[in-house]
């Protein structure tokens, strides 16, 4: 059931035909029931099993041989002339031979086909002259041979002689043990080898040849080409590069290696696009060299010549002295002057040499400083000592200079002698004389004069500063000295000023306050005094906290500091809860302040006795809370006799109880008024349109009716001039504001400031107390014993307490409140009173203007005044829903009317032309859908089934969900479709599974309708009466698509009957398709369109252009000829290439195809790759690592060489600097020349030219030797562009910076990987030699398994891949073999049945009847047929009925009639 077709016997044509899987072969009954019944009875009586006899051979119970022979025993089958079948004592082990001279001599063997031979036990030979000589071997195909045990040969002339080998394809050969050869003339001769592709050869043991024409000669090798034609391996993942890796490496890795070599070579070396490395360019002198050896050789020659030339130049040059790390002016062993020295730059970073005039000026300043210092010796003795030391040093320098003058005079004599010798060389040293710092015999010193003018000497290192130093000093040294001298001068001036002693005696404020003790004795008992310990006025009395009574109400204003009594804000405080948290925070601050205050108690202990009593009873300042505290003995106390405080916004008066009582009375009145308002609102809401918080709209609910006509009336506008009605939420909002007022009062509590300032000024406060304590008795807020509280009585009258800070407002607060706090409360109460009055007015107006309920109408009425009807404006859009009771506004109705107009227009467009003439001519209906019922009775379409649709004149759709389309069409089954005039769909689809069987009515074809949901049948005609073709059908692509005749024809052509042992497939997908000539397709959905192509795997594809192409693996795709795609999703992307540029190859390359193990979107590693040995072998990562290791060693060698070259360059630079101060030509003691050529010419700054005609044209360059040219900066040249020199006799380098000689370079190169050398000696970077040049090859071993996308794979990876491919292929081929075998057996049985039925004779005489029997065999299957025939009495009619059964257990029958004349 996994195909869309099957093969059935067509009785009409007498042949097998391919038809739909669900087709049936059941015909209609006819009138000759008697004949059919009798025939079937006879047929059933002689039905035989699969081991029934065939033909009329011997029937002894031992075997069957229709003209064949046997060797003895039982259970054998020999069919065909001279066919021979062996047997065995056990019937189950019998052999079978079928065909002319077929021979099955092996036990349990089978030979099918003329001259076929199966001599191996359990072997199979299938095909003309096929031979299976090995045990359990399979030979399939004409002249195929399977001589190896367990081997398989498939294809014409295929040969599998190796044990367990597989040869698949025309003339394919698998001679190696467990070898595999797949493809046209593929050969696998090595053990464990595999050859895939047309003409592929795997010769070496465990070798693999992939692709058409590939040859794998070496053991354990993989070949994707041959000696003349190679392929690229694309999409290779990067191989691991380590000491154990056997991975193949990618071109990218090789390129990276080349880049690394180029980077280390330097000299402009780079990697070309093909991976070759451009030769570096090293410039040595005037020569240019393309390799390190040549450059070093030239450099060595130049250095040797230079060293020989400069050996005697040290006599008159100002040279570097290594022992003192400075340039030395010593001449002939004595210190010498340097004359004509221009003034050096004097700066902190100057390195210029300074001349005598600059030092003289310095000395003058030093002398001046010495005089100044002498006058300040009293305060700057240390500076004087330092300056004296400097003076001594300078004096010593003067002495040293005098001594040097004597030496210079002596040197003058020596210079005169040398002048005679130098004069002979004057022509050659003219240029050097102009620029060099030379000895001036006339002055007995080195002269810095240049072109007749004094010049600077720059870059002069700092000279040693010591008593015996003869070094030249540079500008920075003198600048530093001058800086110090100037600083000393400034210091001396500063020190000259008198330093006044700024010691100030600190007076202590220790005033004895004992004289105050008598005057405060009485006051301390009853006065409200300041408590230094608490930093506040204390109401403590007799050791207990006391009240302050008779405290007049303080002024209530924003800036009021009056004290207020606790009762003023009692009611207000009950609503303030937030202050509790504030008090907690303040308490923490007070605790901290208390600790701070305690630390200061020691400074006021002398006052503790005198103010102890006073602190008990006085109303004192509390520093912790920043207020006057009425606390007494730890308890809150009243302040009595407090006059009414001023109530204003700026009042700070304390308020008394009567003031706050009045406020509370007003609050109570407001509360009562608000309650009355709420009652009025409740009564009004019964008949009024009120605001609904839930729907955010006016609700029209009234009484028990929850829905009425008008809802969602917006809230009234709240403004000064608004007369709109307000809802409960608006009034609720007003109440919320009243509550917010209370919260705002709490928010007015200010932060309590720290008492640090008060603590710091404690002494000042004590002094103030001493001054004002006399009058404190009269004016203090004292304790009143009668009232048990502090009294604000003053002069017999109640008084205000002003400047009272705002008290804390909380439930447990005992702070006095000031007038501003009470004023703010009263202001808010007044505001509430006004707001409530406004609310009452609004409610009154609401009764007049509100949209109210009308009991008579049973609805809300928009009537207003005398006007009966009015508009309701500003109505929000009502909700449009089935359960909506909202009022709709005009815009909504307008939108509805517009939609109705649009619908009318749309209906007109849909209806089309409705004129009677148009309908008569074109039929009734709507636009684009019409039925012409002219001349017909007036019938309609009838869709009586639930969800059914009927379209057409008298169309009837009675089945649920059915469709009847067309005149008189009918669909009566649920989900059925009747399509076309007169079509009837009245047969339900049966859900279930039924096997194909023979019944009294004929053969019934099986079906399976349980795998998917059945929606109904589509009918295009009527049962037994009419039908239609479905034309122009596209090819089906999915399992349930309809197929075309073309697809059936292709499917028939793709059916194969060749069985395959060791090949199996387990899939429910579509079958494979081998379209190309000599192609092979294995695996579900696999399609091979190319000639000689091979496709193995699920959904594998070989394109028509990919001749000889191979695709192995699920979804693998071979797009190009002679190319291979191996692995899931692998694709070939380029195929064969001609004249392409390969990496590191100069010569254009050709390839016959491509081997791909991945795709552009995904690559694979080829792992377990053996180390390659031949030129075209793949290399693994291990081989690359060996190369990389050698490159690393070479790189290190090159680095060492570069270091040595750098050191040589340093030496040359040092020599060059020395030469700059010495005569470049002529002779000295150790320097001689023998030439009459042109003078040397040092043109560049700081350049040196040594040798006749030598030219140092560039800055800091050196030209060594006759005619040498140094025309580039910072270079040493020992020749010119046309004439080069070697640097010979170079000793072997030892240190990192030593020069190396050719012997060392050769030794270094001996073990390294080298590039090929061109005929001219240059490096050919397109070829990398791995051997010693003797002609042998080198294998890159230890290639790690590839990991990255572009790694090369090693042999192990490739071997494993091939093994996995083989395993997969074997599995799929085995699965396919099983399927093919089953199909073959079924078809062979059917063909045998057809042959048997065709062999039935029939009656021919008029009135005669005949019963006949016949047998048939085909391809190992047999069948028997019986038939009944008769001829009518007139002889005109002939009737036949026949049935057959074959060895596959299939039964079939046929009936026919004919008329003859």
From Swiss-Prot:
The UniProt entry's GO CC annotations, sorted and at most eight, read: cell outer membrane; cell surface
Gene3D superfamilies noted in UniProt = 1.20.5.170, 1.20.5.2280, 2.60.40.4050, 4.10.80.270, 6.10.250.2040, GSPII I/J protein-like, Serralysin-like metalloprotease, C-terminal
Where is the segment annotated Surface exposed passenger domain?
55-1372
The annotated region (Translocator domain) lies at: 1373-1461
Asked if the Swiss-Prot or TrEMBL record annotates the protein with the keyword Hydrolase, the reply is: no
Question: Which keywords appear in this protein's UniProt record, sorted alphabetically?
Answer: Cell outer membrane, Membrane, Protein transport, Signal, Transmembrane, Transmembrane beta strand, Transport
What's an example Gene Ontology biological process for this entry?
A: protein transport
Q: What happens when the gene is disrupted?
A: In vitro, loss of sadA does not affect cell aggregation, biofilm formation and adhesion to epithelial cells. Disruption does not affect the course of infection.
Pfam families found in the cross-reference section: ESPR (PF13018), YadA_anchor (PF03895), YadA_head (PF05658), YadA_stalk (PF05662)
Where is it chiefly localized? other
* Location relative to the cell: Cell surface; Cell outer membrane
CDD domains, per database record: LbR_YadA-like
> Which residue spans traverse the membrane?
1407-1417, 1421-1431, 1440-1446, 1450-1461
Record's signal peptide? 1-54
Q: How does it assemble?
A: Homotrimer.
Domain comment? The signal peptide, cleaved at the inner membrane, guides the autotransporter protein to the periplasmic space. Then, insertion of the C-terminal translocator domain in the outer membrane forms a hydrophilic pore for the translocation of the passenger domain to the bacterial cell surface. The surface exposed region contains four YadA-like head domains and extended stalk regions, multiply segmented by FGG, HANS, DALL and neck motifs.
- Spell out the note in the miscellaneous section: Immunization of mice with folded, full-length, purified SadA elicits an IgG response which provides limited protection against bacterial challenge.
Protein purpose: Involved in cell aggregation, biofilm formation, and adhesion to human intestinal epithelial cells.
Family assignment?
Belongs to the autotransporter-2 (AT-2) (TC 1.B.40) family.
Q: What is this protein called?
A: Autotransporter adhesin SadA
Name of the gene encoding the protein in the UniProt record: sadA
């Amino acid at each position: 059931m996994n195909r869309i077709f099957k093969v059935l016997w067509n009785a009409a044509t007498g042949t097998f035909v391919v038809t739909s899987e669900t087709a049936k072969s059941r015909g209609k009954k006819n009138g000759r029931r008697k004949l059919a019944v009798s025939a079937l009875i006879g047929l059933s009586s002689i039905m035989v099993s699969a081991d029934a006899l065939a033909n009329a051979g011997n029937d002894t119970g031992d075997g069957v041989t229709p003209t064949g022979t046997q060797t003895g025993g039982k259970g054998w089958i020999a069919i065909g002339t001279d066919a021979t079948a062996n047997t065995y004592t056990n019937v189950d082990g019998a052999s079978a031979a079928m065909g002319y001279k077929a021979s099955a001599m092996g036990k349990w063997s089978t030979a099918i086909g003329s001259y076929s031979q199966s001599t191996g036990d359990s072997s199979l030979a299938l095909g003309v002259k096929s031979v299976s000589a090995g045990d359990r071997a399979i030979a399939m195909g004409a002249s195929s041979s399977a001589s190896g045990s367990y081997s398989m040969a498939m294809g014409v002339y295929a040969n599998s002689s190796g044990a367990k080998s597989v040869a698949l394809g025309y003339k394919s050969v698998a001679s190696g043990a467990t070898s595999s050869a797949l493809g046209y003339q593929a050969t696998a001769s090595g053990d464990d080898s595999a050859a895939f592709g047309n003409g592929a050869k795997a010769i070496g043991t465990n070798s693999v040849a992939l692709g058409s024409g590939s040859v794998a000669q070496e053991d354990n090798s993989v070949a994707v080409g041959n000696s003349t034609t190679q392929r690229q391996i694309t999409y290779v993942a990067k191989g691991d590069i380590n000491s154990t890796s056997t991975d193949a490496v990618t071109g990218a890795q090789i390129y990276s290696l080349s880049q690394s070599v180029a980077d280390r070579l330097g000299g402009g070396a780079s990697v070309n696009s093909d991976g070759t490395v451009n030769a570096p360019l090293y410039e040595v002198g005037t020569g240019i060299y393309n390799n390190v050896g040549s450059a070093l050789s030239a450099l060595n020659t130049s250095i040797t010549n230079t060293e020989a030339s400069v050996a005697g130049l040290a006599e008159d040059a100002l040279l570097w002295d290594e022992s003192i790390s400075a340039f030395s002016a010593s001449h002939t062993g004595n210190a010498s002057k340097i004359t004509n020295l221009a003034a050096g730059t004097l700066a902190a970073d100057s390195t210029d040499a300074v001349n005598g005039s600059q030092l003289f000026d310095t000395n003058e300043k030093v002398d001046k400083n010495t005089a100044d210092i002498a006058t300040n010796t009293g305060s700057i003795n240390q500076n004087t000592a330092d300056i004296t030391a400097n003076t001594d040093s300078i004096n010593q320098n003067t002495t040293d200079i005098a001594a040097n003058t004597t030496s210079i005079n002596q040197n003058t004599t020596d210079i005169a002698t040398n002048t005679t010798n130098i004069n002979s060389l004057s022509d050659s040293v003219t240029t050097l004389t102009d620029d060099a710092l030379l000895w001036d015999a006339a002055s007995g010193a080195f002269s810095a004069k240049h072109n007749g003018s004094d010049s600077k000497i720059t870059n002069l290192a700092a000279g040693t500063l010591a008593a015996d130093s003869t070094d030249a000093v540079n500008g920075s040294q003198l600048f530093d000295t001058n800086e110090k001298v100037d600083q000393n001068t400034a210091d001396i001036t500063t020190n000259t000023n008198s330093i006044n002693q700024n010691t100030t005696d600190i007076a202590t404020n220790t005033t004895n306050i004992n004289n105050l003790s008598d005057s405060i004795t009485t006051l301390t008992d009853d006065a409200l005094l300041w408590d230094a310990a608490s930093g506040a006025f204390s109401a403590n009395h007799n050791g207990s906290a006391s009240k302050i009574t008779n405290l007049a109400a303080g002024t209530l204003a924003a800036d009021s500091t009056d004290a207020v009594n606790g009762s003023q804000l009692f009611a207000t405080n009950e609503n303030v809860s937030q202050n509790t948290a504030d008090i907690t925070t303040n308490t923490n601050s007070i605790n901290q302040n208390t600790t701070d205050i305690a630390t200061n108690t020691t400074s006021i202990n002398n006052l503790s006795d005198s103010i102890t009593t006073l602190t008990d009873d006085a109303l004192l300042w509390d520093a912790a809370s920043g207020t006057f505290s009425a606390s007494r003995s730890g308890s809150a106390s009243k302040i009595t006799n407090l006059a009414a405080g001023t109530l204003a916004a700026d009042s700070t008066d304390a308020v008394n109880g009567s003031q706050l009582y009045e406020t509370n009375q007003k609050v109570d009145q407001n509360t009562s008024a608000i309650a009355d308002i709420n009652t009025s609102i409740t009564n009004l809401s019964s008949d009024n349109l009120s605001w609904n918080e839930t729907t955010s709209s006016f609700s029209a609910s009234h009484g028990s009716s929850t829905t009425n006509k008008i809802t969602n009336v917006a809230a009234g506008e709240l403004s000064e001039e608004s007369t709109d009605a307000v809802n409960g939420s608006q009034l609720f909002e007003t109440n919320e504001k009243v509550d917010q007022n209370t919260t705002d009062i709490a928010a007015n509590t200010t932060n309590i400031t720290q008492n640090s300032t008060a603590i710091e000024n404690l002494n000042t406060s004590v002094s103030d107390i001493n001054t004002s304590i006399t009058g404190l008795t009269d004016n203090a807020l004292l304790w009143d014993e009668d009232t048990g509280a502090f009294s604000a009585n003053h002069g017999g009258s109640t008084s205000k307490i002003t400047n009272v800070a705002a008290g804390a407002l909380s439930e447990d607060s005992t702070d006095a409140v000031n007038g501003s706090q009470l004023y703010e409360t009263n202001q808010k109460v007044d505001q509430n009173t006004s707001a409530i009055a406004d609310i009452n007015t609004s409610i009154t107006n609401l009764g007049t203007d509100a949209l109210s309920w009308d009991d008579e109408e049973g609805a809300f009425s928009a009537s207003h005044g005398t006007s009966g009807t009015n508009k309701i404006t500003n109505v929000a859009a009502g909700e449009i829903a089935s359960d909506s009771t909202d009022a709709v506004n005009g815009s909504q109705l307008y939108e509805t009317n517009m939609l109705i107009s649009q619908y009318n227009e749309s209906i007109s467009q849909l209806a089309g032309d409705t004129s009677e003439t148009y309908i008569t001519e074109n039929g009734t209906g709507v636009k684009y859908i019409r039925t012409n019922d002219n001349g017909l009775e007036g019938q309609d379409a009838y869709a009586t089934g639930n969800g059914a649709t009927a379209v057409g004149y008298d169309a009837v759709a009675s089945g649920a969900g059915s469709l009847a389309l067309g005149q008189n069409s009918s669909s009566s089954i649920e989900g059925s479709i009747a399509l076309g005039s007169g079509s009837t769909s009245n047969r339900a689809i049966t859900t279930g599974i039924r096997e194909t069987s023979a019944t009294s009515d004929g053969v019934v074809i099986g079906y399976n309708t349980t795998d998917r949901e059945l929606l109904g049948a589509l009918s295009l005609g009527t049962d037994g009466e009419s039908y239609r073709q479905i034309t122009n059908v596209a090819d089906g692509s999915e399992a349930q698509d309809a197929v075309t005749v073309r697809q059936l024809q292709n499917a028939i052509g793709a059916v194969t009957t060749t069985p395959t042992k060791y090949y199996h497939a387990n899939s429910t997908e579509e079958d494979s398709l081998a379209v190309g000539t000599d192609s092979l397709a294995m695996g579900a959905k696999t399609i091979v369109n190319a000639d000689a192509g091979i496709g193995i795997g699920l959904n594998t594809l070989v394109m028509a252009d990919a001749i000889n192409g191979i695709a192995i693996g699920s979804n693998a795709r071979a797009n190009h000829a002679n190319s291979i795609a191996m692995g899931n999703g692998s694709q070939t992307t380029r195929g064969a290439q001609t004249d392409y540029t390969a990496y590191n190859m100069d010569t254009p390359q050709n390839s016959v195809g491509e081997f791909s193990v991945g795709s552009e979107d995904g690559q694979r590693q080829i792992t377990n790759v053996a180390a390659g040995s031949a030129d075209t072998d793949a290399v693994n990562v291990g081989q690359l690592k060996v190369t990389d290791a050698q490159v690393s060693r070479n790189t290190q060698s090159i680095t060492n060489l570069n270091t040595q070259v750098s050191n040589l360059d340093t030496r040359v630079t040092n020599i060059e600097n020395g030469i700059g101060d010495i005569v470049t030509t002529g002779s000295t003691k150790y320097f001689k020349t023998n030439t009459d050529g042109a003078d040397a010419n040092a043109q560049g700054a700081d350049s040196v030219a040594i040798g006749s005609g030598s030219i140092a044209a560039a800055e800091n360059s050196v030209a060594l030797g006759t005619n040498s040219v140094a025309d580039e900066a910072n270079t040493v040249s020992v020749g010119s562009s046309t004439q080069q020199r070697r640097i010979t006799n170079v000793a072997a380098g030892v240190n990192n910076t030593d020069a190396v000689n050719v012997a060392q370079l050769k030794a270094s190169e001996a073990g390294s990987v080298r590039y090929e050398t061109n005929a001219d000696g240059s490096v050919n970077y397109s070829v990398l030699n791995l051997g010693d040049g003797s002609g042998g090859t080198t294998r890159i071993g230890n290639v790690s398994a590839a990991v990255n996308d572009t790694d090369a794979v090693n042999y192990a990876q490739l071997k494993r891949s091939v093994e996995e491919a083989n395993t997969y292929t074997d599995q799929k081929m085995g699965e396919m073999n099983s399927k093919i075998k089953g199909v073959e057996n079924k078809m062979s049985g059917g063909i045998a049945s057809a042959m048997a039925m065709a062999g039935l004779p029939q009656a021919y005489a008029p009135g005669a009847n005949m019963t006949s029997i016949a047998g048939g065999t085909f391809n190992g299957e047999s069948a028997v047929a019986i038939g009944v025939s008769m001829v009518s009495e007139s002889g005109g009619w002939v009737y036949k009925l026949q049935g057959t059964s074959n060895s596959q257990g299939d039964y079939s029958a046929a009936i026919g009639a004919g008329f003859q004349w």
